[in-house]
C-alpha cells in the first residue's frame, strides 16, 4: 500500500480474505450463519485485521478490492465486507467486494445488496469477475453430492456476467464498478453501457482491469480511448502466485483466446518494424 501510493502506481490494493485468518473458521461461519461463543475471539481478530487494512487505506485515500474465494467460505466474507462498507463507504467508495459471475446465484445476490443499500448515501463498490475456482467447485460438489453453484456452461457464465453489468449500469448512481475481464465482448458491452448512460470515458465510477502481461491489446486500447485501466499484479510466494495464474489461464478461455490474438498482433508488429527498417 505504501509503495503504491508513494510512487503513484495505483489507487487500488487487493487482498485475499483467507490471508487474514483460518479458512476453516470462514467455512464454519458461512455454513452456520453465526459465530459461536468459542470462535468469537478468533473471529474478532480477523475483523480487526480487516479494519487495519481499511483504516490504512482511508489514511492514504486508497481503494481496497476484497478478493472472492470458494463458495463454501464466501458468505462469511460477503457479510464481513458488507458490514465494513456501511462504515467506510461514506466519504468515497473505499471498499469493493468481488462478485464471481460464474456462480448462477450472484446476480440475485447483487440485487439483494443493492436493495439493502437502497435509499442510503452508501455507494456500493463491486469488482465484477467471471471466477477462478470452477474445477475446484465442481469437484467438491460431485464428491459431497450437492448441486454445483457454478453455471453449467461458458455461455451461461457469459450471460451472468453481462447481465450483472447491465444491472449495475442501469443503477450506476448507486455503484462504483471495477471490471476484471479479458473478454473483448464484455469490455465492449461495458463501453456501450457507459455511452448509453452518457458517462465520460474517464468517469471514476468505472475501471477496467486485466492481469499484468495478459490481454495488453485490450488494456492499451481502452487506455488510449481515455478509460480508466488497471493491471493486476499478483504478489506473494512463487508457490502460491504461479498456481493462481495457472488457474486463471485454465479456467478462463478468454485469456487463452487473447493470448493467441496477442501473438498474432506481435508478429504483425515485428513484420511492420522490419519493413520500416528496410526502408
Positions of PLM-derived features:
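Positively charged, amphipathic and often flexible ligand-engagement surfaces
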Residues: 1-279
Amino acid at each position: 500500500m505504501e509503495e503504491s501510493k508513494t510512487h503513484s502506481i495505483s489507487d487500488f490494493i487487493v487482498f485475499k480474505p483467507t490471508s487474514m485468518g483460518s479458512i476453516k473458521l470462514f467455512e464454519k461461519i458461512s455454513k452456520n450463519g453465526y459465530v459461536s461463543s468459542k470462535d468469537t475471539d478468533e473471529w474478532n481478530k480477523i475483523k480487526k485485521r480487516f479494519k487495519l487494512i481499511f483504516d490504512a487505506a482511508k489514511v492514504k485515500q486508497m481503494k481496497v478490492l476484497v478478493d472472492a474465494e470458494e463458495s463454501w467460505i464466501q458468505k462469511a466474507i460477503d457479510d464481513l465486507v458488507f458490514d465494513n462498507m456501511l462504515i467506510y463507504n461514506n466519504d468515497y467508495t473505499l471498499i469493493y467486494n468481488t462478485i464471481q459471475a460464474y456462480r448462477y446465484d450472484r446476480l440475485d445476490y447483487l440485487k439483494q445488496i443493492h436493495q439493502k443499500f437502497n435509499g442510503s448515501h452508501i455507494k456500493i463498490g463491486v469488482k465484477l469477475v467471471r471466477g477462478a475456482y470452477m474445477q475446484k467447485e465442481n469437484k467438491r460438489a460431485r464428491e459431497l453430492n450437492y448441486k454445483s453453484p457454478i453455471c453449467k456452461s461458458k455461455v451461461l457464465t457469459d450471460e451472468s456476467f453481462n447481465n450483472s453489468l447491465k444491472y449495475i449500469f442501469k443503477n450506476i448512481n448507486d455503484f462504483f464498478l471495477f471490471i476484471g475481464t479479458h473478454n473483448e465482448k464484455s469490455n465492449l458491452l461495458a463501453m456501450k453501457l457507459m455511452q448509453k448512460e452518457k458517462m465520460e470515458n474517464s468517469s471514476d465510477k468505472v475501471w477496467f482491469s486485466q492481469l499484468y502481461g495478459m490481454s495488453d491489446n485490450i488494456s492499451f486500447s481502452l487506455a488510449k480511448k481515455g478509460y480508466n485501466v488497471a493491471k493486476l499484479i499478483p504478489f506473494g510466494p512463487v508457490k502460491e502466485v504461479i498456481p493462481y495464474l495457472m488457474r486463471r489461464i485454465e479456467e478462463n478461455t478468454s485469456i487463452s483466446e487473447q493470448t493467441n490474438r496477442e501473438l498474432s498482433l506481435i508478429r504483425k508488429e515485428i513484420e511492420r518494424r522490419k519493413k520500416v527498417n528496410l526502408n
